[in-house]
Amino acid sequence: MSDFGNPLKKFKLVFLGEQSVGKTSLITRFMYDSFDNTYQATIGIDFLSKTMYLEDRTVRLQLWDTAGQERFRSLIPSYIRDSTVAVVVYDITNSNSFHQTSKWIDDVRTERGSDVIIMLVGNKTDLSDKRQVTTDEGERKAKELNVMFIETSAKAGYNVKQLFRRIAGALPGIIKDDPVEPPNVVTMDPIRQRQIVTDEGSCWC
């Protein structure tokens, strides 16, 4: 039986990874089904929210987009601390960003222990001719670290919906069916909130 009348369950997803791996682009593709070719580094932390309709309930996903630059690293543990899901993103054309995912995952487990869902995401599959990290390498690391794994392209939209479907299926108390969207229901319910502004006059991205 559907419990659409019950209060929304809220789950916090924090996106982590090196600068320019595509964290913001993945969120933008999921929220708005769009892609911005103009790169602008995230300043501080951005927060967005979207309602997702599952087989047996409705949930609100709170998406926290973190900056990859070193100068913002000290801010990130406080955002990891109460998260349900950590999405650790790397760029398949940048082997260093892949190697750094081990550190990001360590940071998550330092703050959350084992009480967290971790998804390792290899982004930018549209640039396969420049690939430096194979799919097998990503799968092996995910298995070694006991985390989930998927490859995506925020630019092409490849596997982005599947990424969030798999996350939704792994959420605590959620039956692991693919989420469905009831007909004639608008699911995009974005709330954007600037959490931290460190550079005066900077624009969000």
UniProtKB/Swiss-Prot annotation:
Phenotype caused by lack of the gene: Grinder formation defects, whereby the grinder is formed, but it is small. Animals have a fragile cuticle phenotype, which is prone to rupturing at random positions along the body. This phenotype is intensified in response to hypotonic shock. Due to a compromised cuticle barrier, which increases permeability to exogenous chemicals, all animals become paralyzed in response to acetylcholine agonist tetramisole or the GABA agonist piperazine.
GO BP terms in the entry: adult locomotory behavior; cuticle development; early endosome to Golgi transport; intra-Golgi vesicle-mediated transport; intracellular protein transport; mechanosensory behavior; positive regulation of feeding behavior; protein localization
Annotated tissue distribution: Highly expressed in body wall muscles, pharyngeal and vulval muscles, hypodermis, intestine, the gonad, coelomocytes, and neurons, including command interneuron (at protein level). Highly expressed in the terminal bulb muscles.
Pfam short name (any one): Ras
Sites of S-geranylgeranyl cysteine lipidation: C203, C205
Gene Ontology CC entries for this record: cytoplasmic vesicle; cytosol; dendrite; endomembrane system; Golgi apparatus; Golgi cisterna; Golgi trans cisterna; perikaryon
Keyword presence, Transmembrane: no
Residue sites binding GTP per the record: 18-25, 42, 66-70, 124-127
Keyword GTP-binding: yes
Subcellular location: Perikaryon; Cell projection, Dendrite; Golgi apparatus; Cytoplasmic vesicle
Alphabetic keyword roster: Cell projection, Cytoplasmic vesicle, Golgi apparatus, GTP-binding, Lipoprotein, Methylation, Nucleotide-binding, Prenylation, Protein transport, Transport
Modified positions (Cysteine methyl ester) in chain numbering: C205
GO molecular function: GTP binding; GTPase activity
Coiled-coil region: none
Sequence intervals crossing the membrane: none
CDD domains linked to this entry: Rab6
Highest rank taxon of the organism: Eukaryota
Assembly and oligomerization: Interacts with GARP complex component vps-52. Interacts (in GTP-bound form) with lin-10. May interact (in GTP-bound form) with eat-17.
Protein family membership: Belongs to the small GTPase superfamily. Rab family.
NCBIfam families cross-referenced by the UniProt entry: small_GTP (TIGR00231)
Functional description taken from the UniProt entry: The small GTPases Rab are key regulators of intracellular membrane trafficking, from the formation of transport vesicles to their fusion with membranes. Rabs cycle between an inactive GDP-bound form and an active GTP-bound form that is able to recruit to membranes different set of downstream effectors directly responsible for vesicle formation, movement, tethering and fusion. In its active GTP-bound form, acts redundantly with rab-6.1 (in its active GTP-bound form) to positively regulate the retrograde trafficking of cargo molecules from endosomes to the Golgi compartment.
Entry protein name: Ras-related protein rab-6.2
Gene behind the chain: rab-6.2
